[in-house]
Amino acid sequence: MWINRLVKHPSYSVLRFYTKRLCTVSVKSLREFGVLPNSTICHSVYPRRTYVMGRAVINDILIKKSYSTHTVCAIDRSKDENNGSAYDKFEAKGIPIDVHTLKRIISSSGMDESEFSKSISYLFAKTVDPEPKDVLSLEDLSFLLNKLYTQRFQIRRICRDINAKYSEFWFKLFSLYAEKVDAKRNQVNLRNTKLDACEIFDANLMIKNFIELGQLGKAQKILSFILDRNPDILLSPKNADISTIVHFLQLRCGALAPYWKIPDNSEQKQGFLRKMVRLGAKNTSIRLSSTYKAMDHQTLLKIADLALQEKRLLNSEDLLSTLIQSFGHLGQTQILERCIEHIWQISPQEFPSHVVIKHRGCYPSSKILVSILVSFYFNDHDLHRGLSILDSFIKHYPDVKLDALFWRRLFQLSHFAWTPANDKKATSVVRCWHLMKQWYASKRLRPSVDYETLRQLYDIMKKTGNFPLGIDVLRSFKPGIERMRAENAGKVNNIIIKYQKCIIKELVNRGRFSAVREFIDNYGFDRKMTKDLNIFCANRMFLRSKKMKNKIENKKEREKVRLDSFDDDEDDGMIIGSLW
């Protein structure tokens, strides 16, 4: 197997001028279609920028499932034969792979390597080039890998339908890709050369895929595949690759906040240890790598030193975000504070509001603020320090955009930090809710709906009995909920129905029947849901009346028993008195 042949090879810059393969296949095609100017290929000053732009344009085009004839006519094509053939080849590449072909390829992943290689060749002939090829080139396999990645969600559904292992299919595909890389270097006597930019891009794409699946062990193997062939890809000022550094920090330095175990104070019971939870939505299906806990402290400090000096690294939002999470996971909060102060001039000591702050790196984003918030909570087990720094960011960087993920993490952490014994009404969580509404109102935006945020707020409403909070949530999120129901009604309906039933139950129990009718009229969303809510409301009202009736009858019965016992005592007293 290829994994046994992974050895370290000295090699040179990953960011060198790109290989003949990239120029002839990617950029040349783009030039023929009029997407890039003719001077792009010969431009040797910014090869990395040319490569990234070309790859981005290709991926953007491939995602589009169909190409209309009107679009075809709109493209300015030359009449010569070369441009025509290039366009035809491009048209073939733009067609998505059909379900039958995908099923055949996925089923073949359980076979040996030679049979799987033949199936991949069949896939290439079916979708790109009808001419049969016994052995695919590395360029062809690279294209198929990227194309399959754009259809990964469809592939996952097929794997579920035919009972195939989704992650094993991708790892088998990468095994074939790695063998092609070694075979190419053996043929042209380039065994000691580094991976080129396209090969690094493909490998990082696979790492990203396995991290999304929670298959960190497989992601670690692919990362080793890159590092063994490109030893200077992390710490060289000229050759450092941002995607590889990000994946190294995630896999070797703990910069995967959704997988961190966070103490949940809201579920703590007296005499028991606190429950540990993960922030990720699918935390129960995560398979952590055994090497995930083997943290590389020294390399982290070297990467941080390089990142704080190199402008292109400071401008990377992903790199700074993972760097912050790495320091947070390793408990280096003092270094984290110094990094934040160096890059954005924000410190725990409050600056006067009139001080002008200039950032040295990228403008703070929602992703960076989430990393800061989670990192400090992970070490402090409360939100005081994180919210203090967050408040300074919002004050001195008013254009920062806070997306749905930021508010989701804020509600999760505020919920976990909530201690019911000290705060029965969960005022800290409710305060975060009002903060979110105020921020969206100041930006004149509608709050973006997030399923996990809805779930967190529902738990707070149910535990505290704060049904006005639930009504306020439905009122604020109503336009977004309607959009979500149009896209995927099944998942969002479950949590919305919980809100509705809990609120109706509370209103009925308090005898506010007119408020119940008004609530159903405003938040029924459709006829079927309104009908179901009316039935549920009628049942609750019947149960309430029955309960009240039983309560009155029981009260009368107790009163009657008390009077009877009083009469008996009076008779006994009269008898005893006459005896005396």
Curated annotation (Swiss-Prot):
Assembly with partners or alone: Binds to the 5'UTR of the OLI1 mRNA.
Keywords per UniProt: Mitochondrion, RNA-binding, Transit peptide, Translation regulation
Phylogenetic placement of the source organism: Eukaryota, Fungi, Dikarya, Ascomycota, Saccharomycotina
Targeting presequence: 1-40
Database matches in Pfam families: ATP13 (PF12921)
Gene Ontology CC terms, in alphabetical order: mitochondrion
Role according to the record: Required for translation of the mitochondrial OLI1 transcript coding for the mitochondrial ATP synthase subunit 9.
Family stated for the protein in its record: Belongs to the AEP2 family.
Molecular-function GO terms, alphabetical: RNA binding
GO BP terms: regulation of translation
Organism: Saccharomyces cerevisiae (strain YJM789) (Baker's yeast)
Compartment annotation: Mitochondrion
Name this polypeptide is given: ATPase expression protein 2, mitochondrial
